[in-house]
Amino acid sequence: MSGPASSTGFHIHAEGLHGRNVQPSKPTSDGGVAPTALGEKSRVEEDERTDSEKKTFGRTPDGTIFTVPPTRDMVSQLLSPSEPKNLSDIFVLAIISCHIFLLRFLPSSSSRVAAFAIIFLFWRAAYNIGIGWLLHMQSNGRTLVCWAKKSNIFVNPSTGQNPHPILYNLLKWELETKIPEQYSFEDAPTEYNTWLVFRRVVDLILMCDFTSYCLFAIACGGRPAGEGFIMLALRWIAGMSLVLFNLWVKLDAHRVVKDFAWYWGDFFYLIDQDLTFDGVFEMAPHPMYSVGYAGYYGISLMAASYKLLFISILAHAAQFAFLVLVENPHIEKTYNAPPPRKRVAVDTDNVKPQDDDVSQDSSVINDNVYSGQAVATLEPSSMHNLLGPHNIDLYRITDSSVLLIQILFSALAILTPSTPVYQFFFVLNAALWRVWYSVGIGYILNRQSHCKMWTRHFVKYGESNQEAWQQWKGTYHLSMTMTYASFIAATWKMYSFPQDWGYGLVLLRHILGASLIALQIWTSASIYESLGEFGWFFGDFFFDQSPKLTYSGIYRYLNNPERVLGLAGVWGAVLITSTKSVIFLALLSHTLTIAFIQLVERPHMQKLYGQSLRRDAGLVRSLKRSLPPSLKQFHGSVDKILDDSIEFIEEFIEAARPKLAAGVKTFVKDTSALFQKYPARITISRLEPDLAGYDQKDYSISLEGTQSSEPAQFERASGKEGEKARSMPDRRGDKKNLMFEYGAPIKVKWTAPLNHSKKDWIGLYMVTDNTSREITRISSQGRWIGTNKASFDSLTCEQGLISSDIVINKFREDGEPKDVASGEMVFSGDKLWWTQGVFEFRYHHNGKHSVMAVSRPFEIRIGRFDDDAIYGDRYGLVRAAIESALLPVVQNCFDRDPEIAPQTVEEQYGSLVDRNGKYSRRVVFAVHQMFGIEFAPEVVRADGNVRNLAWRICNAKKVLAPYSMSRTNGATTPTAEHEG
């Protein structure tokens, strides 16, 4: 895992906006040598440096640097009598007081519960949906800053440009009262002032959210009937402990991240300081949203209310959705931008053509190391993962076998009766599979680590290391799924449906059990995200790579997350069933898992990585720092006892020769869904009343683009038509059909009257999507550009705009010359359609859907690769032709971005191709249309360059030659020569 990085765009680990610790960057000395004695002048210079180090400098997107003044936290500003109060503070306190009075004056307990449930859900929706939408729009289009600039609310009224002088003076007084030091309302950038106003809105929502939750807890609170004093005391002690822990998490998090990250400051501007992780951020991922909500469950425990518990779970889930949909995409875009591509000069004269008879399994290309010679001589590796529902492939024997066995297990568990005999056999079956998964798999890995037993077996029969690896993955995957399928079947057999959900702790046990199962699923997904397919299947037991150990993802906090969290679902099943048999299976699973880690994984890791293995993870380090000296000494003694015990067990097992091993793994379930969707524009579809003032003859649209290849233009005459239609049609006039390359940028030139609306816009549509030429009745889905800058509330609509309102003299269709406004824009990337078809551009009036002009229809077509154009059947000629045809298509699919699009067939793709799947999906669609071969998107990412992809296409065409669409390859269908 990479270390802390600068906030200006270097790679760091995404931990959530509330997970960024900001520490000042220390300026370096010019001379590099400290003086031995300081005079008066030196002391003055040092004091000045110290003062400058205390200042924080911000940087806006346009490069403006400013001093970020110190601010105080929300609670102190509102509740501390020593802090100055302004109108916004009084307003927030008044709203909070209304909540408290409402609780006091509502007549009945049921009305208080219902009212405050609705009020809390309203404020929670305002937080997660309202603030989330504002931040999403600000992140993608800088919408809030655009609103501020369009309204001119931060412009001094003395300039005559601010139509709201009262609002200006109010905001000036409000903000300068709150920030008395190092702040000037007039001099601060618009981004910073916008953030300060946004903070006041956030203060209102957060305070009301917290207050309404506490009042809802008071309304729901009570003591269960028949509860003893001991249970009451335990419930309150546990609840208070969780609340105090929650309070410590919030305070420590605010100490670490300060107000800048607490209020999502980097959605507006960045600060020139280092970002590090400290305190609570070493304990858990996203602590503000994970352990930072422990207080919800503590309050629910003290209130003894299931209503409060269910709403707490709902609010917590909404907060995770906010993290996944809003914060994580922004952090990935802002801080984890792909690094610049390393360009390597390739000597093409020394590259030898590759023999097509070389086995694909003979070598594997390292995705992170690039060499021109290696790319030319090594074949690309396969990319066909096993884990995850999206990777299920029923053509693969492993997947089909696993699916059939799962169906069999489910049928046996459901259709057989739950008698003691069947229960015994299901529990025995689960125990045997667990023993095999631990002892059997552990023995294989141990022998593989010591003497490459598994690999040697396949080499003995002439197979490669890659074949051994693929077979091992299938064996391990089958064993893992069978282990958990048998455990689930045994749990199902031992489970009895509750007759009364309200009796005792039945409902609570089910809630806690389901939570533990969800925790194990999340842990497994996090482990897979950190390790990948290679690490999940213990790839370092099979491949000798240069040892490089990194701790990322969940491994930043825990050394072996599968030891505890990876088995949480097993103990969740124990809580749900409450049977001795499931407790036995859980104990067996946990014991064998620990033995597997200590006896198989740990020795291999020590042998492979040696001293680079860390002793303590982030969570352990944080806990050790919090322990008093006496407990630290006790912890050291316990560690020594555990180490001695483990050493004794290892010696005993080594003498007995059985090898116990287990690793608890589970299916991966991806809970992240990042939606980056540009806002569709206006949906109102009525004629504007002021259209009569505009002459539609003054509006026009003309297009320029890269013409498609000749094969695409001549494919209309393919021999399938009637005899008269097999030749190209005669055209009268000088205009030819517009047919552009797939993915190539299209330049749009427009004209409009001099008084046209500044909110006019041009959208791209399929011709068949609109039946009317006067009104557009379908959204553009982000494929639109405004004709003028600063006319809409998002910067997204300005991407591609080149020029606007350039006055030219134009001859209209009726021959009359007239001065009109003109402009140019380029549609590229996400503003294009990534499919084949016939399209048109539409010019719309005043931000509405009234159509003023429509462009000529144009076609996007991918020409099929013509094998007949290559003379002979030499592999080198075919491959070179494929490379030549493929390179411009791949460049278009990668938006012609020099950071990711290759300039030569040997050059590696940029790293953004691996992060964003849309690029590889564009390429596989184009390959399918050009060559009739369908690849998975993972293949494009695995190949890494055009040369490897061309080799794969050649190989696929060779394998599928009898079924080729070309007339020269086989005669499975009648050709023209055979037709009678």
Curated annotation (Swiss-Prot):
It is a multi-pass membrane protein. It catalyses: a 1,2-diacyl-sn-glycero-3-phosphoethanolamine + S-adenosyl-L-methionine = a 1,2-diacyl-sn-glycero-3-phospho-N-methylethanolamine + S-adenosyl-L-homocysteine + H(+). One of its GO terms (molecular function) is phosphatidylethanolamine N-methyltransferase activity. GO terms for cellular component: cortical endoplasmic reticulum; endoplasmic reticulum membrane; perinuclear endoplasmic reticulum. Residues 1-86, 136-200, 250-282, 327-399, 447-475, 522-566 are lumenal. Pathway: Phospholipid metabolism; phosphatidylcholine biosynthesis. It is an enzyme of class 2 (transferase). Belongs to the class VI-like SAM-binding methyltransferase superfamily. CHO2 family. Catalyzes the first step of the methylation pathway of phosphatidylcholine biosynthesis, the SAM-dependent methylation of phosphatidylethanolamine (PE) to phosphatidylmonomethylethanolamine (PMME). This is Phosphatidylethanolamine N-methyltransferase. It comes from Paracoccidioides brasiliensis (strain Pb18).
